[in-house]
Amino acid sequence: MGRVISSWRVLAVVAALMAMAAVELCAAIPFDERDLESDEALWDLYERWQEHHHVPRHHGEKHRRFGAFKDNVRYIHEHNKRGGRGYRLRLNRFGDMGREEFRATFAGSHANDLRRDGLAAPPLPGFMYEGVRDLPRAVDWRRKGAVTGVKDQGKCGSCWAFSTVVSVEGINAIRTGRLVSLSEQELIDCDTADNSGCQGGLMENAFEYIKHSGGITTESAYPYRAANGTCDAVRARRAPLVVIDGHQNVPANSEAALAKAVANQPVSVAIDAGDQSFQFYSDGVFAGDCGTDLDHGVAVVGYGETNDGTEYWIVKNSWGTAWGEGGYIRMQRDSGYDGGLCGIAMEASYPVKFSPNRVTPRRALGAKETQ
């Protein structure tokens, strides 16, 4: 695997991770049992929360959402008070959203529905990492300079695009030695044959779009807007373009196979992120109650082990740096569940890249390139 980018850039990445942890702590709003003693105290906490997170609510909406806020605050308090679960929760910017609203707004890949409809693009045959042996005990592609900063999808169900981009950014850095931030908005606007922008999509389909359209452009050339738009062919054709040769799927329901892939590159995965404990995750190794309704696309960028021997996946999310551990979550590895915790090993895939990147614009967006 070796060095991906120069040492000074790796140091910059480590410094950025430390800065994100500081941002995460500042983003939390503390409360204690006195804030739960009465509805009046909870209402005061609710108003402090709105001011802290800059969440404007008109009077009628505040009253409508207050019930969800109370339930969430009590849930967070009881979880942290019990302790012993290896992870903590905190009152973040999602504080007055009920579970169904949260799932519909921020966990919108609709992966299960799209696969049931037979809309997943076919992968390249085989699993190129099948023969990998003697895996390192820990891998962190952030520290190898293959992961860009945490991004924020906003109120757009574009998690699939962010998951795709993390994996493509990673393999591009590994193959070329250059870390380049790529455009999620191009995928939202232009990859519309089988994906649906802010209404959901599949990472496999996005990989195939990138392959057949001759690459994906940079974030600076085609910046994120958190909304569906018309494909801007002028922006999308701007060079340089990062090229891939397709994608492969990780053998389903095998965390061992997933580890082989992650040891070699960041991997896109679909998970069930609709649980209340996932919504308010703060820090530690997450081992919450979640099913396998795969509704959210994220990327595994490493794995490791705590001092007490708990194994975990390092997962990059797209809900900004104020959520979780600076925008990341450590999820329990080898949990004993079929498909892994929250289904993390059920639908994993990664881009394959051997071809050089383009230094000239594409001919016409959407026209398939000859291979």
Curated annotation (Swiss-Prot):
Protein induction: Induced by treatment with gibberellin (GA3). Induced during senescence and pathogen-induced cell death.
Annotated active site: 159, 296, 317
EC number: 3.4.22.-
Biological process (GO), any one: proteolysis involved in protein catabolic process
Expressed in which tissues: Expressed in germinating seeds.
Residues spanning the signal sequence: 1-28
pH-activity relationship: Optimum pH is 4.5-6.0.
Keywords: Disulfide bond, Glycoprotein, Hydrolase, Protease, Signal, Thiol protease, Vacuole
Hydrolase keyword on record: yes
Database matches in Gene3D superfamilies: Cysteine proteinases
GO CC field: extracellular space; lysosome; protein storage vacuole
SS bonds (residue pairs): 156-198, 190-231, 290-342
Glycosylated residues (UniProt): 228
UniProt xrefs under Pfam families: Inhibitor_I29 (PF08246), Peptidase_C1 (PF00112)
GO molecular function: cysteine-type endopeptidase activity
Main location per the UniProt record: other
Enzyme class, broadest EC rank: hydrolase
Subcellular compartments: Protein storage vacuole
Family listed: Belongs to the peptidase C1 family.
Note: Plants silencinge REP1 develop early senescence at varying levels and show enhanced cell death when inoculated with the bacterial pathogen Xanthomonas oryzae pv oryzae.
Name by which UniProt lists this protein: Cysteine endopeptidase Rep1
Protein species of origin: Oryza sativa subsp. japonica
